[in-house]
Amino acid sequence: MGQTYRIDRLNLITRKRRPQKVVNEARCRYLAKSQLVKCNAQNKHFDYLNFRGSHFKKVDFSFAKISGCDFWGTSFNKCNFSNAYITDCVFMGCKFIDCKFDTAHIEYTTIVNTNISGCRNIVLGKFVEVLSQYPDFQHTSDLEEVLEALKNNTNICKYKLLHLPGNKYNRLNIYLLQKKFSPEELPKLLWRISGKSNKNLTTYKRLELELKAEKRMV
């Protein structure tokens, strides 16, 4: 029997002739399958939010700061990212339709299997990685042993950071981790977090930062 988790998601929809709903700032939340329509997110800070499978329509993110967030299978329809600051995010299999990115700053971000032709006036920073195909990672027996053990970590599994449904690995996140840590380091660092709650490790970037913190303590 699969594990059940507490549902945490946003469902903000501004109806006709009603005041525009405002998106509150948030940090370290797993907000899968959220839905935001005709909302105001101007000048807001969003840190380490996981919007897997979410839908945004006519949301105004102008001048917002979006840091360390994950967007897997997320759709953006006629959203405004003008002058937004987007850093350390992951966009995987996303769909953009007629979105504005005028003077947006995008850096240290990974974009995979995502067509950005629907992003008007987008300019990608020097340290943005764009992958047309889902990557694989370097398999080792030590790594696979700790990945198997981490299947029992409730929050690591809930946030789908290392494992995906169908008993599959999250190859993208593991690929990104192997760019930051050596093949010898990564399994050891993952073991160090295996017995922890990891409640706040909601996105890839939070996981990376936690492993870096563990490395400093070794």
What are these regions (language model features)?
Residues 130-218:
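Terminal module of membrane-associated proteins
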